[in-house]
Structure formats: C-alpha cells, structure tokens
Amino acid sequence: MARVKRGVTAHARHKKVLKQAKGYYGARSRIYRVACQAVIKAGQYAYRDRRQRKRQFRQLWITRINAAVRQSQMSYSSFMYGLKKASINIDRKILSDIAIFDGFSFNILIKKAKEALL
C-alpha cells in the first residue's frame, strides 16, 4: 500500500482555521493551535449570544414601554393586563416602537387599557 502524505489536506485545514481567525489579536490570528482554540471559543460565544440577544431585546422593549407608561401614572404590568382585557394584541416590539415614535397613538392605547381595567 502506498504511503499517504497529508500535507495538502493539513495545509488546507490550517488555512481554513486561520481565515476564520482573521482579525483576532496577536497569536490568535497567526498560530494554528491558538487560532483553533480561539475560533472554537468564538463559536461558543456566538451560539450563546444568539439566544441571549432575544432575551435582551425583550428586556429593552419592556423597559421602554414601562418608561412611556409611567409618564401616565400607570405601571407596565397593569398596562399589559389592560391591553389584554381590551383584546388589543400588539407585541412588545411594536408597542415600544409606538411609544418612541408615535406618542399620540400610544396615549390612545393607554386610555383604552385604563378603560378596560375599570
């Protein structure tokens, strides 16, 4: 059986990892062994943070809605409960956009939520 030399395959693998590590600081972008670890860790962070991003945006939307609702002497939880009772199904992302860019419409939503609570 002929001897299999792996130089071409190994070089291709090293090149692939170093390409992924491009832009990293110091040895992480130049030395294969270190770059390999850095790329794996970066992948772990990316996987984790794709899930955290969803939580963080929801948290941001809730904070924005709460800030806008408190100007009308109402709490976030009672506002959301009032909207639910009034059968107004708008998600938090859209509510926060309305609160920021269209205060007039948001005030109407607050009034409807207050009426539904009475």
Swiss-Prot record:
UniProt protein name: Large ribosomal subunit protein bL20
Species, as recorded: Buchnera aphidicola subsp. Schizaphis graminum (strain Sg)
Function: Binds directly to 23S ribosomal RNA and is necessary for the in vitro assembly process of the 50S ribosomal subunit. It is not involved in the protein synthesizing functions of that subunit.
Annotated NCBIfam families: rplT_bact
GO CC annotation: ribonucleoprotein complex; ribosome
UniProt keywords, alphabetically: Ribonucleoprotein, Ribosomal protein, RNA-binding, rRNA-binding
Record family assignment: Belongs to the bacterial ribosomal protein bL20 family.
Family annotation (CDD domains): Ribosomal_L20
GO MF, any single term: rRNA binding
Lineage of source species: Bacteria, Pseudomonadati, Pseudomonadota, Gammaproteobacteria, Enterobacterales
Gene3D superfamilies: 6.10.160.10, Ribosomal protein L20
GO BP annotation list: ribosomal large subunit assembly; translation
HAMAP family recorded: Ribosomal_bL20
